């Protein structure tokens, strides 16, 4: 009996001395040992991580040493190391792993923080960014180029996110997409002297106003040209015929013969336009088709008399949308995609003008009546310049912008000399100021227009820099 007591006491002491032997292995999960982090991180004491890390290199639980991260789908949250690059440890029901979760001995899985598909530079679509990164690491291991992200979403398709800022606020792009098919590029040709060969001499823009091919543009774009060619947005080209011209208003109507219906632009009410409204100008400056500029309406009623333009009785729309050579004749539209003007004139940076759409409506109505009655369009005299009256305030503004601007306060300021015209042949240049013709003083641009209609020879005195130069220009009679 005494021997049995001694044996039981020995076993009890053995169990107390080694509690880990009290339970057989596998009967339960022991709590994970707490990670003890050093008070200060010393990277020099860190063991170098393996070079082959499929999950990428990440910081350890203490945020000190670099270790190999676990792959997507690997276990995490207990004794396991941290998840790899771009992955997070998530326990059941999608809860991110935390210290509380770990104390409760719950295991999780490494899940990619990004769930949307991406397109790689290897032209493959990956389920998420983490899979692409893993593929890139495998590629580099094989001494191949790394795989980089080309776009969000699957390869070969755009990423449409209706909640993105660019989707909500790109109203200008919406307008351009709507109007661009009805905007045309116009190429102008003339025959060389003593030759039948034609050469391109100028270009401009226009927009379609009827499904059967009527196109509105500026008069100065198409006049004095032997041949007018129109190119649609799809690249198709057509010969165009000039149907009607209003030189004073600088509006022309041309037509192409096209099988089928063409896209058209509708005319808005320029009388309802407000200063500060957003506008879009589209055209073909420098033959660059469908070039878009945007701006606001500076004023809706800039008088022709104030500007010294050819139609002194008409108000113009002033805008800071850029209108360049070749943009002329293209539409100026509001955010509803309605034409509220024809791009016609750039004076200087930030100051451009458009012919109001209400004037276009009047021209189209009168043109219809003229063609219905069979009235012929009379010939006109033409020298090939675009000009504006020079006032003291405008002269001061131009002097501030251009130091070599002539020291003059009135006259007709030449904005543009059209190539291969009497003006160019006579020697006129841009920025010249016409101060007299045939001995008569020139105060406004209208003075020049009046003399051109009456005289067959123009002996001009122009101020160029600070010199007065005598130039002779012989107007040409042309079909408008």
UniProtKB/Swiss-Prot annotation:
Q: What GO CC annotations are associated with the protein?
A: collagen-containing extracellular matrix; cytosol; extracellular region; plasma membrane
Q: Could you tell me which residues belong to the region Serine protease?
A: 204-364
Enzyme Commission number: 3.4.21.-
List locations, semicolon-separated: Cell membrane; Secreted; Cytoplasm, Cytosol
Signal sequence: where? Answer: 1-22
Q: Does the keyword Secreted apply?
A: yes
Q: Which domain of life is it from?
A: Eukaryota
Biological process terms in GO annotation: chorionic trophoblast cell differentiation; negative regulation of BMP signaling pathway; negative regulation of transforming growth factor beta receptor signaling pathway; placenta development; proteolysis
Q: Which residues form the active site?
A: 220 (charge relay system), 250 (charge relay system), 328 (charge relay system)
The Kazal-like domain sits at 98-157
Domain called PDZ: residue spans:
365-467
Tell me which tissues or organs this protein is expressed in: In the brain, mainly expressed in cortical areas both in glial cells and neurons (at protein level). In bones, deposited in the matrix, with higher level in newly formed bone compared to fully calcified bone (at protein level). Also expressed in the tendons (at protein level). In the articular cartilage, detected only in the deepest zone of the joint cartilage. Not detected in the chondrocytes of the growth plate (at protein level). In an experimental arthritis model, at early disease stages, up-regulated in articular chondrocytes in the deep layers of the cartilage (at protein level).
- Report the record's disulfide bonds: 37-62, 41-64, 46-65, 53-68, 76-89, 83-110, 112-130, 119-155
Q: Which CDD domains match?
A: cpPDZ_HtrA-like (cd06785), KAZAL_FS (cd00104)
Query: Which key words tag this protein in UniProt?
Result: Cell membrane, Cytoplasm, Disulfide bond, Growth factor binding, Hydrolase, Membrane, Protease, Secreted, Serine protease, Signal
Recorded GO MF terms: growth factor binding; identical protein binding; serine-type endopeptidase activity; serine-type peptidase activity
Principal localization reads membrane
Keyword check for Coiled coil, yes or no: no
Which phenotype arises from disrupting this gene?
Answer: Mutants mice exhibit reduced retinal capillary density, as compared to wild type animals, in all 3 retinal layers, nerve fiber layer, as well as inner and outer plexiform layers.
The UniProt record lists the IGFBP N-terminal domain at: 33-113
The protein's matches in InterPro entries, at most eight in alphabetical order, are given as: Growth_fac_rcpt_cys_sf, IGFBP-like, Kazal_dom, Kazal_dom_sf, PDZ, PDZ_6, PDZ_sf, Peptidase_S1_PA
Question: How is the quaternary structure described?
Answer: Forms homotrimers. In the presence of substrate, may form higher-order multimers in a PDZ-independent manner. Interacts with TGF-beta family members, including BMP4, TGFB1, TGFB2, activin A and GDF5.
Domain notes from UniProt: The IGFBP N-terminal domain mediates interaction with TSC2 substrate.
Q: Which family does it belong to?
A: Belongs to the peptidase S1C family.
Q: What is the protein's known function?
A: Serine protease with a variety of targets, including extracellular matrix proteins such as fibronectin. HTRA1-generated fibronectin fragments further induce synovial cells to up-regulate MMP1 and MMP3 production. May also degrade proteoglycans, such as aggrecan, decorin and fibromodulin. Through cleavage of proteoglycans, may release soluble FGF-glycosaminoglycan complexes that promote the range and intensity of FGF signals in the extracellular space. Regulates the availability of insulin-like growth factors (IGFs) by cleaving IGF-binding proteins.
| Protein name (database record) | Serine protease HTRA1
Can you name the source organism? Mus musculus (Mouse)
Task: Name the gene that codes for it.
Answer: Htra1
């Amino acid at each position: 009996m005494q021997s049995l007591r001694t044996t039981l006491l020995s076993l009890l002491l053995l169990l107390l001395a080694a509690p880990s032997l009290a339970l057989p292995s596998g009967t339960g999960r022991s709590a994970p040992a707490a990670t003890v982090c050093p008070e200060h991180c010393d990277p020099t004491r860190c063991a170098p991580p393996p070079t082959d890390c499929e999950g990428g290199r990440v910081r350890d639980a203490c945020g000190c040493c670099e270790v190999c991260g676990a792959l997507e789908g690997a276990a995490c949250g207990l004794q396991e190391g941290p998840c790899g690059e771009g992955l997070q440890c998530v326990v059941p029901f999608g809860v991110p792993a935390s210290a509380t979760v770990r104390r409760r001995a719950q295991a999780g899985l490494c899940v990619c923080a990004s769930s949307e598909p991406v397109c790689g530079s290897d032209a493959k679509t990956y389920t998420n960014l983490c899979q692409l990164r893993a593929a890139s690491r495998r590629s580099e291991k094989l001494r191949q180029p790394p795989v980089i992200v080309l776009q969000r979403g699957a390869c070969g398709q755009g990423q449409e996110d209706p909640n993105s800022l660019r989707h909500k606020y790109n109203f200008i792009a919406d307008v351009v997409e709507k109007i661009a098919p009805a905007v045309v590029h116009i190429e102008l040709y003339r025959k060389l002297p003593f030759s039948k060969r034609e050469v391109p001499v100028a270009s401009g823009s226009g927009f379609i106003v009827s499904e059967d091919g009527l196109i509105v543009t500026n008069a100065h774009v198409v006049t004095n040209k032997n041949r007018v060619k129109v190119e649609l947005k799809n690249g198709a080209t057509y010969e165009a015929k000039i149907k009607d011209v209003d030189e004073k208003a600088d509006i022309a109507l041309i037509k192409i013969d096209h099988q089928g219906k063409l896209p058209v632009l509708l005319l808005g009410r320029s009388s309802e336009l407000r200063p500060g409204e957003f506008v879009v100008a589209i055209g073909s400056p420098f033959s660059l088709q469908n070039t878009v500029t945007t701006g606001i309406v500076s004023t809706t009623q800039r008088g022709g008399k104030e500007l010294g333009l050819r139609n002194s009785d008409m108000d113009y729309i002033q805008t800071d949308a850029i209108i360049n050579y070749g943009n002329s004749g293209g539409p100026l539209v509001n955010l509803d995609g309605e034409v509220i003007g024809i791009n016609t004139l750039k004076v200087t940076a930030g100051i451009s003008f458009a012919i109001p759409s209400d004037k276009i409506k009047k021209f189209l109505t009168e043109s219809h009546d003229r063609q219905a009655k069979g009235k012929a369009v009379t010939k006109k005299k033409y020298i090939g310049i675009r000009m504006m009256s020079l006032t003291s305030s405008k002269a001061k503004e131009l002097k501030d912008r251009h130091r070599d601007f002539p020291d003059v306060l009135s006259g007709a300021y030449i904005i543009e000399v059209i190539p291969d015209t009497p003006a160019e042949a006579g020697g006129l240049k841009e920025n010249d100021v016409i101060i007299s013709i045939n001995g008569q003083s020139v105060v406004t641009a209208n003075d020049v227009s009046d003399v051109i209609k009456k005289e067959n020879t123009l002996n001009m005195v122009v101020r160029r820099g600070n010199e007065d130069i005598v130039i002779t220009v012989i107007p040409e009679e042309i079909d408008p």
